[in-house]
Amino acid sequence: EPFRGRFADPYDGEVAASDAAVGGFLAALKKKGLYEKSLVVFLSDHGEGLGDHGEDEHGVFLYREAIQVPLLVKLPSARAGEKPPLAGSSVATPVQIVDVLATVADAVALPGVTPPEGTLSLVRLAAGEKAPPRRLLAETFYPRIRFGWSELRSLVDGSWQYIDAPNPELYDLATDPGEKKNVVADKAGPIRAMKAEVEKRKSGFVAPEAVDEE
């Protein structure tokens, strides 16, 4: 409450509660005279299935509804009364949550901070800097830890999205943004290259294990 009773769908109530919490936070910054000088980053760590691809939660699959999340940045204003730099700008280049550190370090000139190799600053992208080509990796271990199924990994390369699974999937996001038509049988070349990239990335990570509930 007060949102639970106002919405038939509990998820809608959660969205409204989150919206109110963010609004209250921004209002408090303004009331204290801190909003203009503040760097504000709003993001989510995951999306939600809501019935898409048969999933009514999150964590099981790696389709766009789960891995494409909001990421908004408000930069500090140079002087009181001025609009924040790059206000209203958007970035068409696909980015990752790991790009937040590079963005924050760039926005407020954090001393002694070296962002991880391969990450990008959204500040520079919004200002017009071109991003180098990147393959974006996502992964979920929830199916293995929770159900004993296979873990999944997804690699986005341009318009292609490859899902590394016991039955691999490949989607052309340019023509099929809803990921309805698996074209893995028709695209052996992209599959080989993306599968090799996933295997290379896997070798550099340690997989998490389930936490004992006790």
PLM ranges: what are they?
Residues 1-214:
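Catalytic domains that recognize anionic headgroups
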